[in-house]
Amino acid sequence: MRAILRGLLPATLLPLAAYAQEATIKEVHDAPAVRGSIIANMLQEHDNPFTLYPYDTNYLIYTNTSDLNKEAISTYNWSENARKDEVKFQLSLAFPLWRGILGPNSVLGASYTQKSWWQLSNSKESSPFRETNYEPQLFLGFATDYRFAGWTLRDVEMGYNHDSNGRSDPTSRSWNRLYTRLMAENGNWLVEVKPWYVIGSTDDNPDITKYMGYYQLKIGYHLGEAVLSAKGQYNWNTGYGGAEVGLSYPVTKHVRLYTQVYSGYGESLIDYNFNQTRVGVGVMLNDIF
C-alpha cells in the first residue's frame, strides 16, 4: 500500500500544476475569475468538462516538530520509533456539480482535501504514514461583489464538512460540521472567516471543540510576487487554539517555494488536543491568491 501511495503522490500533484495558475478560460455567468475567489474560479468553464479546480492550497514540505504525540499512536507497533521529522503534504480539489443552480453566480460544488504526515525518513519502520486526514465537502457557493468600507465580499459558501482520519478505535478521530465561509478582499489583503456548527456524534473526540473552537480565520497579504498567509482557530472560552503561518514565492510558472510554521493545538485530528510547533519548507502549486 505504501508503494502505491508513493507512486500516486507525484502522479497526483504534478498534473494539478496545470490548474494552479491562471489558464485560458471562457467567462460564464458574468463571473470572471477573481484573484483568491474559489467560487468565481469554479464558475469558469474549461473545454474539458472534467476539470478539477484548486480548493485549498496544494503543497509538499519537509518538516520537523518540537514534540511528537507518541501517546496517541501508542497502539501502533512502531510508535516508540516514530521520528519528529516528516513529509507533510496537502491535496485539495473542487469540482462544480451544477453551475447556476440558484442564479447565474451560484454553483453547487464538491471538494476533497487530504492532508498527510509521512514518516519518510523512518526506513527502519518502512516509512509509515503517521496520520492522514480526509475532508470531503458538499457546498453551495455564490460569487458576489458587495462592497463595504473599501472591502469587497467575493465568496459566500454554505455546506457540509466531514473530517476523519479513517482509523479504527482507539485512534479513530472524526467530526461532522455545517459551515459558512465568507471571503472578502481589499487591495492586497484577503480575509476569510469560516464558522461552523458540529453535528452528529463526536464520540472519538468528545472535547474537540475545546481545542478547535467554532470557526477558522484566514488572512492573506500579497507582497509583490510573494504571498504571506496566516490561518487559525481559537476557543475564547478555553484559551486553546492553533495557528499556521506561511510564505510562498514563485520559482517557476507553476511552482512556488513555500515555508510553513504551525504552532498550537489541532494541526491534525490525531493531535487535536496536543500542543506542538512544526516548521517546514518545500514547494506549493497554488497559494490563496
Curated annotation (Swiss-Prot):
Enzyme Commission number(s) of this protein: 3.1.1.32, 3.1.1.4
Domain of life from the UniProt record: Bacteria
Keyword Ligase: no
Signal peptide per UniProt: 1-20
Subcellular location: Cell outer membrane
Record-listed Ca(2+) 3 binding positions: 204
Protein's membrane topology: Multi-pass membrane protein
Quaternary organization: Homodimer; dimerization is reversible, and the dimeric form is the active one.
Identification of the protein by name: Phospholipase A1
Organism: Salmonella typhi
